[in-house]
Amino acid sequence: MSTVVNFQGKKCIEPGSYAAVVYNPTSVVNVAEFGNVMIIDTGLSLATVNGQQTEFAGGSGVKGELNQGLKSVYQFDNYEDFLAFMGGGLVGDIAYKIFTPRDGVAGAPKLFYVRAATTTAAKITLTLSEGNTLVFTCKNEGLAGNGIAVDGIVKVGYAAKVVAGDASGKFKVQIIKGTYKGADEYGEPYGAYSLAESTPDIITESEDLGTLAEAYEWAVNDKVVAANFNVSKKGADSTALKAIAQVLATGGTTVFLNDGEYADVLEAIEELDLTFFLCTNKNAASGAGVNAETNGKLFTYIKQDAKFSEHMFVPGGEDDTDLFGESNSSQSIAKYFNSDQVVVVHGAPVVNRKDGNGTKKLPTIYLAAAIMGMNAGMAAQTPLTFKQVGYQSFAYDLKRKEREKALQAGIMHVRNISGYWCVNQGVTTLQNNKQTIAPDGQSLELSISLIKAQINKELILEGQVRFTGNTAAQASPESVKNFTETKLASLVARPGEDNLLISWKNVGVTGRNGDYFITYDFVPNVPVNKTFFIGNMLDFTF
């Protein structure tokens, strides 16, 4: 039986390295990544096209037909690949700000995406005759695979048909994919073309074929087919092909948050190297920011179960009506979480319409994505304070008194500084903001919280490789102490080289049975928020 160690309020049972930071002052190659972002989709990808429900998403839900669990978590290191995977939609549009928070500024190094949903795969069934079929099962499961056509033209999802070949008596199989990327609440398309203008792509076409066996052999060996479908057949191999009119993919289903899917996501991602979560409530309306089934569960996870110290960005209110208040407001969200691992962002960007017909208001999640993406592209110790965001107009401009109250309430917001809209201060939702570092080690400053998290991650990742699974003779207290001191020294800032720490001291190691407990003191590389210049004016003399 494994011993249970209570470490900083967590029950540690499995072998491994664990780390925490407390505020209790006393008289190597860094391996951890920073800035990886995760989106747990709770229905943001759903849309309606031509009166039919669809979805702009790829892969399978966490409870999928073809994949489940961690295999349903998808990773991307650039926006183009993510957009191609999603096929458009609101999530695809928001993600641009995660990778490129503003023009010329790099954002998150990686984006992880998963649907907290149960999905079944859509299928295209080409029937040659009774009992003789060729079936394409969509790997993009759920509603996303279902074909939707307008006047016979595929707009989203998949379809296939069999057309006459070049030689007499031969036929070609064509696989078709819609290219429409959806539209926002104002009816403006996310992509370059409207629903009426969009035309489908023939993503692959076979050579001349004559029988079911030949069609199946082509399908299982075609790279495009393999990337998009599982292929099966029924019937006699010698069945002759024939022309078949366009057949839409059908039968794909997506059900979000129905049967423990959110918990399954959290279980699947436990070992992933993540820094930020972008919560998928659009704003503070209807209590979505504090939904116990989504954001509430995520908060419990990052506080109790996550391997690393991760952070949530929660979209808050949009204007003056939902800035303060006991419910459905940025203030109520901040009070609910009250943690330095949670950020609530207030403010709805206003942008020009693509058709040039005035402006439109975007939901707060766009600003949250932009700020989070900007933070993800910087070093952990770099504060968000006075960093320019990628928007230049907002639904409501906070007055000075409101900005001051918002900072005290733990609400991150923007402010116009010398003609540019910037983050006023990189604050967390921690309500105990009388001092920069609270007695429990939490901080009102996001950059300090991220410093803590990054130090912990560095120690965990390298510590478990060096020591876990060795014997006490191989991993002596002296070697553990030397490693910790070397690691901390590598994280100290020096002239011309910024880093996580200003200084460290007092590394101590104690052992009990097969467990080592390492303590150390450090001074984080804190942000500079205010500068006060006092001039001493002198009399003119000569």
What are these regions (language model features)?
Residues 2-469, 480, 487-492, 501:
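A glycine- and small-residue-enriched flexible loop/hinge signal that marks low-structured segments
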Residues 497-542:
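Compositionally biased, low-complexity/repeat regions
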Residues 1-2, 542:
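Short, solvent-exposed mixed-charge patches
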Residues 470-474:
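A short beta-alpha structural unit
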Residues 482-486, 518-520:
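A generic structural signal for well-ordered alpha-helical surface patches
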